[in-house]
């Protein structure tokens, strides 16, 4: 599984996505793919309407073909070491390539969950 995490991190570093406007306490992120195409979105999980497309176009060099080997990792880290940072709260995998409307609805639902830092 660690190889899958490292491969994804390497792939994402191979092109410069647009940065988020400002740091957030809770981040919602989506990675969507189909043949020859990759979309990455992120937004503030406490603010409706903040979902931003960071990349929507061709896959990075070396990842043009969808090779589906390996494990699926949802979370922070992947090798059970204590060196990861952050916290992972929820994850989901779906089939197909979701519409803009579906992505916005998911974002609104996450915001409605009311993630907050306690006192």
Where are these regions (language model features)?
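Extracellular glycan-associated modules
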Residues: 1-119
């Amino acid at each position: 599984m660690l190889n899958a995490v490292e491969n994804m991190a390497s792939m994402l570093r191979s092109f410069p996505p647009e940065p988020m406007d400002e740091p957030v306490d809770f981040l919602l992120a989506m990675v969507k793919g189909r043949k020859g195409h990759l979309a990455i979105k992120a937004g503030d999980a406490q603010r409706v309407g903040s979902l931003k497309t960071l990349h929507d176009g061709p896959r990075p060099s070396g990842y043009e073909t969808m090779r589906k080997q390996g494990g699926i990792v949802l979370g922070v880290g992947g090798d059970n070491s204590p060196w990861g940072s952050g916290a992972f709260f929820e994850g989901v995998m779906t089939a197909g390539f979701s519409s803009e409307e579906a992505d916005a609805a998911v974002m609104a639902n996450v915001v409605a969950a009311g993630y907050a830092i306690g006192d």
